[in-house]
Amino acid sequence: IRLRHAYLNLNWGSSSLLVGQTWNPLYGEVSPQILNLNMGAPFQPFGRAPQVRYRYNAAGIQVTAAALWQSQYLSNGPDGKSNKYIKNSLVPEFYFGVDHKTSNFIVGAGVDVLSLVPRTQATVDGNVYKVSERITTVSGEVHVKYTSPLWHVAAKSVLGSNLTQVSM
């Protein structure tokens, strides 16, 4: 089954809690204006993920924290794309971001941490050995967007590592 968006969002005014599957937070509020689903990959992070996301808004500042898992957009590893690498790690992907918003301007940044265990055993000359391997990557993004009735100007930069789960 391919699930696009299915979530529960509890909104208390200045804060909200989202539980379910929706856009990966790296996708963000600054993305290309498009006519079809060509989202700009491999330059724009694109993917949906099961997640628990908390947002707090105060005085034009929005803080986002999320813990994510992988379902259909997967990390690549020794056995190809699979969700077993994040299952082996027992640690979700984490995201933290801050945005400053006005009626027509957004500027912000975010950090994503992903820790995977690509394999738990290795076979050498017919012998199976237990291995202890972990890869932890930190990725960052900054973005800015200005909109008016006549203009839409946006810029985003991603410095990423091991971001196959968001089509990069």
Region locations from a protein language model:
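Outer-membrane beta-barrel translocator domains and adjoining extracellular loop/strand segments
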Residues: E29-L37, Q70-L90, L114-S132, Q165-M168
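Outer-membrane beta-barrel transmembrane strands
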Residues: Y54, L68, K87, E133, ...
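Detector for outer-membrane/organellar transmembrane beta-barrel domains
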Residues: T102-M168
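Outer membrane beta-barrel
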Residues: I1-Y73, L90-V91, Y95-S103, Y146-P149, ...
